[in-house]
Amino acid sequence: MNSVKEFFDSVAGNWDKREKKSYSELDSFIRKYVPISEGMKALDLACGTGVITSILYNITKREIDAVDISSEMIKCAISKNNNPDIHFRCDDFMNINNKYDIIVCFNAFPHFIDVEAFRNKAYELLNENGYLVIIHNLSRKQLDSHHSFLSSDISRSLNPINEEALVFNGFFNTEEIIDNDEMILLSLRKAC
């Protein structure tokens, strides 16, 4: 069995207690930093318990796909989001085949161990000029502390974000990088 799935299945029931920001704060955060607008087809990648899924839906005003490898996380997400236009799916990102205008990976990037496979799949799924947004509402230092007890098959330490961005060169154009004491943002646009 997949160790990332096993880990997140085991913590799903208490996961939302870890989020320190209110829904309103998360809504403002997403609207400020994620280049998403009404009408965009979006994927909430590694959606967990659906912390930002309804925010993405409220912005795009259209159906949202939300995928997570953990069935327990998906159960929590479904219980919080009773909306027929939000499609939760328990699956590996590598099995997704729909096309999107934007893929948002919120608070999950360190759990994608094979960054090149992640990059290739995101590129495949994005429409022309589509966005890949990797965003955390924690700093790298906070993330490293948060993940310090996890094995390397569940999470990895992030390099400075400008270094993480290098693997996306040739596939994506970098739109914005933020790597500070409060957050991480790597906003990328599919190169044509």
Description of each model-found segment:
Residues V133-L158:
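Conserved class I S-adenosyl-L-methionine
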Residues L43, T49-M94:
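Class I SAM-dependent methyltransferase SAM/SAH-binding core
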Residues K21-E38:
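Conserved alpha-helix/loop element of class I SAM-dependent methyltransferases that forms part
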Residues E116-E128:
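A short glycine-rich, Lys/Arg-flanked "PGG" loop and its adjoining helix->strand segment in the class I
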Residues V104:
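A conserved beta-strand element that flanks and buttresses the S-adenosyl-L-methionine
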Residues F171-C192:
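Core SAM-dependent methyltransferase catalytic element
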Residues S155-F171:
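Short alpha-helix
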Residues N107-A108:
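Short catalytic micro-motifs in class I SAM-dependent methyltransferases
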